[in-house]
Amino acid sequence: MSDSPVELPSRLAVLPFRNKVLLPGAIVRIRCTNPSSVKLVEQELWQKEEKGLIGVLPVRDSEATAVGSLLSPGVGSDSGEGGSKVGGSAVESSKQDTKNGKEPIHWHSKGVAARALHLSRGVEKPSGRVTYIVVLEGLCRFSVQELSARGPYHVARVSRLDMTKTELEQAEQDPDLIALSRQFKATAMELISVLEQKQKTVGRTKVLLDTVPVYRLADIFVASFEISFEEQLSMLDSVHLKVRLSKATELVDRHLQSILVAEKITQKVEGQLSKSQKEFLLRQQMRAIKEELGDNDDDEDDVAALERKMQNAGMPANIWKHAQREMRRLRKMQPQQPGYSSSRAYLELLADLPWQKVSEERELDLRVAKESLDQDHYGLTKVKQRIIEYLAVRKLKPDARGPVLCFVGPPGVGKTSLASSIAKALNRKFIRISLGGVKDEADIRGHRRTYIGSMPGRLIDGLKRVSVSNPVMLLDEIDKTGSDVRGDPASALLEVLDPEQNKAFNDHYLNVPFDLSKVIFVATANRMQPIPPPLLDRMEIIELPGYTPEEKLKIAMKHLIPRVLEQHGLSTTNLQIPEAMVKLVIERYTREAGVRNLERNLAALARAAAVKVAEQVKTLRLGKEIQPITTTLLDSRLADGGEVEMEVIPMEHDISNTYENPSPMIVDEAMLEKVLGPPRFDDREAADRVASPGVSVGLVWTSVGGEVQFVEATAMVGKGDLHLTGQLGDVIKESAQLALTWVRARAADLNLSPTSDINLLESRDIHIHFPAGAVPKDGPSAGVTLVTALVSLFSNRKVRADTAMTGEMTLRGLVLPVGGVKDKVLAAHRYGIKRVILPERNLKDLSEVPLPILSDMEILLVKRIEEVLDHAFEGRCPLRSRSKL
């Protein structure tokens, strides 16, 4: 800042300061956005650069301006030269304001000349409005003699109020002024000594007392702290130096006394603070000390932020008490200590868990939910009906503890997507917990914090990720859990799925109870057998059977093909798969209960089409780019006046139209064999494999749905032993022994030996084999199939190739019911088998089989083994005696 008096022109452009005062020597930064202010800055400061000088006048306004701006939204009239004379302590704006309907502006009669220390110009987007950021320094006081409008801003005729250089030199020798100066400096120094421990900028203010001339000192010092607008105006009006120093001393002393009184009150209140409040204040002071030392400031800020986050987490009172104890322990530790990171991670988990946060459920519309289920899942009528019933109960009683639904069925039938549909209908977040291969109880309950690398269980971690306490949680592949020395995860799930216990689920890592009662649990499994009975008892089993070929066809046309095309960047304009070709893919290339293999085959067709489409797209892009590039080169060179050393020859046809609309690729049988290879399955498989005696066709149920199981029997020279192969379980081995015993006992009745005294196994062994030896097999439903194979072997008669069977047998020849009837019938239909022998007591299960399948097959119901044999052989099985044991 310059200490020499400023040469003040007779007229100054005036910038209004609403409810603010700029004092000589003070520096202020403002942002000009109003058109009139922008015009003033541009003409008086930006264009004149260092020579620019403006006047700053305080403006009285009934409404204070916003913190971010010191400018008036409008100053004066845009036309005319109407002037205003000085009247009292303020100058009123010209009468044009009243005529234009604007509220009169009350200008102060005294102002300060100012110069720009820094100017920056900007343009707001997208409006394009020009703005200026100006740093102004106050120079000297002036009084307004006349105020007139010049275009958008005002110009004032001014007269200087500050002393000349000669007057200043004489005033500095005045004893009264010297005494006032000393008194002011003493009061200011006392204020600085009080503030120097609280404000870092006090040191710079202290230097001003020794370096700034006395006639500037009062203005600069008073401008450095907050005072009211009226007090600022009184300082501006204090033209005489003695009056100014007296006024400044009074303001500084008043500010000092207010600080001392506030400190006294603070000290008095601190004596009455509680222990926790004192601890908080001490920690604040400790943080300030560490900031000065540059030690652990970031860590301390992080810990404070973590504590605030914990306070906002909504923990129950007992858990909050536990968290506070952990927080106190963390504060006593240094970040370098071994347990610091684990303690910090634990507290972050407590802060992140959704103790009270829930996702709001919208009003359930069962019609919309049903339409959504029908749109996302084809078929599965009974399953979708059960889900609608579940949602109806939730609608009538939202806080009801519904059952834990467990969808059991082969892969690819939509178990996971059904759980997602429930979450969608309830407007809840969805989280999937995969339990396949989990053998450690700690995966469910978490590891204790004493272990290195410990972490919470999958349930708590999932809740942390979704950040709500009431999601729909899918326990996927719940039948794939195992057990070892580390515990049994299925046992840990007992507490999770029990509504009486999961209100206070105790994760080992969390070590405090967490309420899981708001979570809607849904489980999926391929088989029920591996699930422990206590866990199975806590769930409602909903079986999802495999799809029929007709259902697969509908699913492929409605869901799979659009999804596959989208995943490969194709559309129906690139690739079309007719319905007949999809049917061939189902019949010849897939034999599964679900549709995953079908989707893989469709994806293979899409990839083959994508290769050709990509080649066409490459050619198309080159054709489109030739013309624009050529034109641009010509235009640019001609514009520069240069000569073009090339000749443009018109093309006979437009390259861009050559591949504009390529014809779609339509899948046919030739493409199927080229892409997918020769057919993997055909209807002749059963006939080819049952072409010799000793082979029968059975039906079994596996984790992937129903399957056709061939049984082969042969005899050889031996000692009457029975050999079984095919990776068989104990139950199926017993069924084979039972079947052989029954056949030997009924050998004479079945015309397998002349009399009942002859031993069928004399001097020969029997070997029974179940093909697909790598697949484990067990269960009692192969009993009737084993008997049929043995009778075929001993009688040297072939079993009908179009007949398959299933059923458990007893030693007395009764046929008992079995499970999985629908899946077994569907498997037979997939293989092209038209006749199925079932136990009579399984008649009720046929209602689940789709009518188109039943109408295409012959279902034979039997009570005894003899009936099975009658249906299994051409012309019935000749029995010597029809008596039943």
UniProtKB/Swiss-Prot annotation:
Record keywords: ATP-binding, Hydrolase, Nucleotide-binding, Peroxisome, Protease, Serine protease
Positions with biased composition (Gly residues): 77-86
Residues that coordinate or bind ATP: G409, P410, P411, G412, V413, G414, K415, T416
Protein name in UniProt: Lon protease homolog 2, peroxisomal
Reactions catalysed, as given in the entry: Hydrolysis of proteins in presence of ATP
UniProt cross-references to NCBIfam families, sorted A to Z: lon
Domain Lon N-terminal: 12-256
BP GO annotations: mitochondrial DNA metabolic process; protein import into peroxisome matrix; protein processing; protein quality control for misfolded or incompletely synthesized proteins; protein targeting to peroxisome; response to heat
Protein species of origin: Zea mays
Primary role: ATP-dependent serine protease that mediates the selective degradation of misfolded and unassembled polypeptides in the peroxisomal matrix. Necessary for type 2 peroxisome targeting signal (PTS2)-containing protein processing and facilitates peroxisome matrix protein import.
Positions of short motif Microbody targeting signal: 883-885
Positions of the UniProt region annotated as Disordered: 70-104
Subcellular location field: Peroxisome matrix
Family: Belongs to the peptidase S16 family.
Disulphide-bridged cysteine pairs: none
